[in-house]
């Protein structure tokens, strides 16, 4: 078994203009402080304040947005990281694992990965993702790319339709169609950080947000050894070369994960489970008393000193004891959060340490808080109650359906840009307005300059005389539209849809 040396993982170099030479502990920490500044000051982080956590288009500032949720995840991630480092220090293993001079970067990478973990999410969360993927599937039919004979291919885009006698090109068409129809927030986060925002973060910092290791163009079953790590797309074809370089720099085997990503994932799991329930009470979906009864009955068999009694029961009793001086709601969630963290954070930290050989290798094929333990059961309890009583609430479902319609409608509106021929779209990009295409010209003008420049940069590097050119040009045109719409906030997408559908009041 290879030795564990985090100096080989916490790579402080960057893709562009990387610092050179051997660095002192302080100099390395300054490099990661620069990462923090780049991330915290990025527009993508600011936009999280108007993106959905659970309740779309929420006006109540006490209810969480993606930004406030991410800040809470950041704090829990820091807590877990410190707990891990503290335990390793007690065991005199910091130096053995190459962490004695890297505790600051270790914590910083985890914190910033937590803050960025939702950076690529589209408006309206998972329903926004579903709307994008459904819309493109209805036009590209990636499942038909496997069909024989080729005449069964229902793809409406001629350059992406399979052709007889073009097997090499057909392979690229299959990849492109599969990739475009698998938009995913985590993969979009990688694209945002590297391609769109050009943040030029350290290799280690980007490794921290590569949560899933399956390429978006993957077809067929995934290997059992990586079934959990590859359960969702983690990056797109457009970032394939960058991810290949990232793997080399971080010494990651194919489809393996960066070690600190497990901490970010655990912090997210701990944070949102309690937060979703608190937001539901704030929204008056149920009362604290009703929530307690939901949790009590969902737990099943009760024993005096069970984990449920130590965490949930304790919070309930303490909150009822202080009803005269403080809000029961505030008290209950304060104690519930504290009790949950005090149990789950040490457990997550110990799981990280106990499984460090596999985690360091990037092959640990499960989450830190998904096992047969009571701690995992407690987390599952929170999730199940939220699914049964929060996400299925009529008000929540109505807003989700509205969000799905908004994103689908925006894609319908911008569809004329995808219908233009290669030559017509190329001319529109060069001249920005064409009299013979008044609608397309106005739609093109509305696209973000950042997204248009990203399209121009990558397409200008493609050899125009290559047989692949029409296929790849259309791929990046689809990415352009997905980049623009997925980058909107909930409120902007809602307003833009109403304006362009001429239903603005």
UniProtKB/Swiss-Prot annotation:
GO MF, one annotated term: magnesium ion binding
SMART domains: HDc
Catalysis performed (reactions): dGTP + H2O = 2'-deoxyguanosine + triphosphate + H(+)
Positions of the HD domain: 66-273
Signal sequence bounds: none
Any one GO BP annotation for this protein: dGTP catabolic process
Keywords attached to this entry: Hydrolase, Magnesium
UniProt keyword DNA damage, yes or no: no
Subunit structure: Homotetramer.
Job description of the protein: dGTPase preferentially hydrolyzes dGTP over the other canonical NTPs.
HAMAP family assigned to the protein according to its UniProt record, in alphabetical order: dGTPase_type1
The family this protein is said to belong to: Belongs to the dGTPase family. Type 1 subfamily.
The protein, known as: Deoxyguanosinetriphosphate triphosphohydrolase
Species the sequence originates in: Salmonella enteritidis PT4 (strain P125109)
Gene label: dgt
């Amino acid at each position: 078994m290879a030795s564990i040396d985090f100096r080989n993982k916490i790579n402080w170099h960057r893709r562009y203009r990387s610092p050179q030479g051997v660095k002192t502990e302080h100099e390395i920490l300054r490099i990661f402080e620069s990462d923090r500044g780049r991330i915290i000051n990025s527009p993508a982080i600011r936009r999280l304040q108007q993106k959905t956590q659970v309740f779309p288009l929420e006006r109540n500032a006490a209810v969480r947005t993606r930004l406030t949720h991410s800040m809470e995840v950041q704090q829990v991630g820091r807590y877990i990281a410190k707990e891990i480092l503290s335990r390793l220090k007690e065991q005199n293993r910091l130096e053995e694992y190459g962490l004695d001079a890297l505790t600051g970067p270790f914590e910083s990478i985890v914190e910033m990965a937590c803050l960025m973990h939702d950076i690529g999410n589209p408006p309206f969360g998972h329903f926004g993702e579903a709307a994008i993927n459904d819309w493109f599937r209805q036009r590209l039919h990636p499942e038909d790319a496997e069909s024989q004979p080729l005449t069964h291919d229902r793809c409406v885009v001629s350059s992406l339709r399979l052709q007889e006698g073009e097997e090499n090109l057909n392979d690229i068409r299959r990849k492109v169609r599969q990739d475009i129809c698998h938009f995913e927030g985590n993969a979009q986060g990688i694209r945002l950080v590297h391609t769109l925002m050009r943040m030029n973060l350290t290799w280690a910092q980007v490794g921290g947000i590569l949560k899933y290791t399956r390429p978006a163009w993957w077809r067929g079953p995934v290997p059992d050894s990586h079934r959990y790590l590859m359960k969702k797309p983690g990056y797109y074809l457009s970032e394939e070369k960058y991810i290949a370089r990232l793997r080399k720099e971080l010494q990651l085997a194919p489809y393996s994960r960066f070690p600190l990503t497990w901490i970010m994932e655990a912090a997210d799991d701990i944070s949102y489970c309690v937060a979703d329930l608190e937001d539901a009470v704030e929204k008056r979906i149920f009362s604290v008393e009703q929530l307690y009864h939901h949790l009590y009955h969902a737990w099943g068999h009760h024993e005096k000193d069970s984990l449920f009694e130590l965490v949930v029961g304790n919070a309930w009793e303490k909150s009822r004891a202080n009803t005269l001086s403080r809000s029961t709601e505030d008290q209950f969630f304060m104690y519930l959060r504290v009790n949950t963290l005090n149990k789950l954070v040490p457990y997550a930290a110990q799981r990280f340490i106990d499984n460090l050989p596999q985690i360091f290798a990037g092959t640990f094929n499960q989450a830190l808080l998904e096992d047969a333990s009571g701690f995992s059961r407690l987390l599952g309890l929170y999730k199940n109650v939220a699914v049964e009583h929060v996400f299925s609430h009529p008000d929540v479902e109505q807003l989700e359906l509205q969000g799905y319609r908004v994103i689908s409608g925006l894609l319908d509106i911008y569809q004329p840009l995808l219908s233009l021929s290669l030559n017509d779209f190329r001319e529109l990009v060069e001249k920005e307005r064409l009299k013979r295409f008044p609608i397309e010209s106005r739609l093109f003008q509305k696209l973000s300059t950042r997204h248009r420049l990203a399209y121009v940069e990558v397409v200008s590097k493609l050899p125009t005389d290559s047989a692949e050119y029409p296929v790849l040009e259309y791929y990046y045109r689809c990415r352009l539209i997905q980049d623009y719409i997925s980058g909107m906030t909930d409120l902007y997408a809602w307003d833009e849809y109403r304006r362009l559908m001429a239903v603005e009041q």
